[in-house]
Regions:
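Glycine- and acidic-residue-enriched helix-capping/strand-helix junction motifs
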Residues: 1-2
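Alpha-helical cap/lid subdomain in secreted, periplasmic
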Residues: 6-16, 32-174
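A short beta-strand-loop structural module common to alpha/beta enzyme folds
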Residues: 17-29
Length: 174
């Protein structure tokens, strides 16, 4: 019921003959993702979906640090000629307006700078219309991670962007 199997099925149902590889690590930060980039891209890779920053946010890490790490990942993808879908997040107001402004701005700014596709908000499909809080019925008991139905909604919202990403992929990697 996780994201990768659900997205894989969604893509297959739409005729996309691709294999998704989950290079994520539970509890991962942007620093961990940046540190593992070479390893993650060591096999045949045709594109990247970068969905990092949530754990940075939970830890209250300076958005400048998260931004630098995401930039390392985007530079690494660019140097390999890989198209990227960058998945954004929005900070709550818990850390103050300056933190929120800097955190929220980094995803669209980096996507524009590196020519990445952008999904503005990973969690938007889990928010009732005209609300700013997540629908708790779509979340696991921890209140942080989406449950199977929540993942289904995220996949439905992100899927078209993933198809756009696949359209940017050249011949298959060898």
């Amino acid at each position: 019921d996780g994201f990768v199997p659900q997205m894989q099925a969604w893509l297959r149902d739409r005729g996309a003959d691709v294999t998704l590889v989950n290079a994520g690590v539970s509890g991962d930060t942007t620093a961990g993702g940046a540190a593992r980039l070479d390893w993650s891209l060591s096999g045949p890779v045709d594109a990247l979906i970068v969905n990092l920053g949530g754990n940075d946010l939970l830890r209250g890490l300076d958005p400048a640090v998260s931004r630098d790490n995401l930039e390392k990942i985007l530079k690494g993808a660019r140097s390999r000629g890989l198209p990227v879908l960058l998945v954004g997040l929005q900070a709550s107001t818990n850390y103050g307006p300056d933190f929120k402004l800097r955190f929220d701005a980094m995803y669209p700014e980096l996507a524009a700078r590196y020519g990445a596709l952008l999904l503005t908000s990973y969690f938007a499909p889990l928010m009732p219309e005209s609300q700013t809080a997540l629908d708790r019925n779509l979340m696991q008991a921890d209140g942080i991670h989406p449950n199977a139905e929540g993942v289904k909604r995220i996949v439905a919202a992100m899927g078209p962007k993933v198809l756009d990403l696949l359209a940017e992929v050249g011949p298959p990697a060898q």
